[in-house]
Design a protein with these regions (language model features):
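N-terminal intrinsically disordered, cationic/polar leader segments
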Residues: 1-31, 35, 39, 43-107, ...
């Protein structure tokens, strides 16, 4: 992995074997970034996404191995109530069905993804404040808490 800050953005190049969310967290820790949004593209060889099931307050896990094009990655990094960084990302991946050669898609809440060739991520750093996190009793999930200066 390599990264460089240019303006308010950090450009991250991920290499074969890098885990996307771990790398984003490491960059944020190294650069003392409290909150940011990110987007990216690339190729992966192992992806785990999940679908939230509201009635169970739990996720249904989906895992795929093999050549997966990361056609869209979007997410954010926030600071939780204990001061820890938390990533929240959704991704969309395409892959070939082996028998037909047709393209299939896998998308959802990203739990992990391992780079197979390269990943190109743009991290937009929140300036003049930060995004925290708080529990919302109505929905039963953690939501953004918009803060002033960090």
């Amino acid at each position: 992995m390599d990264y460089k800050k240019m303006g308010s953005r950090v450009y991250i190049r991920m290499d074969k074997g890098d885990e996307i969310l771990s790398c984003i967290r490491r960059v944020c820790c190294d650069m003392d970034i409290k909150s940011a949004t990110f987007q990216g593209i690339g190729a992966c060889d192992k992806v785990v996404v999940a679908t939230f099931i509201p009635e169970k307050q739990d996720f249904l896990r989906h895992e795929r191995n093999g050549m997966l094009e990361m056609i869209s990655l979007q997410g954010n990094v926030v600071t939780d109530v204990n001061g820890r960084l938390k990533e929240h990302a959704h991704g969309m991946f395409s892959y070939l069905l082996p028998d037909s050669g047709e393209i299939a898609y896998l998308g959802g809440h990203l739990q992990s993804a391992r780079i197979s060739y390269t990943g190109e991520i743009v991290l937009d750093v929140v300036e003049d404040g930060f995004i925290g996190q708080q529990f919302d009793a109505v929905t039963g999930i953690d939501v953004w808490k918009l803060e002033g200066k960090a």
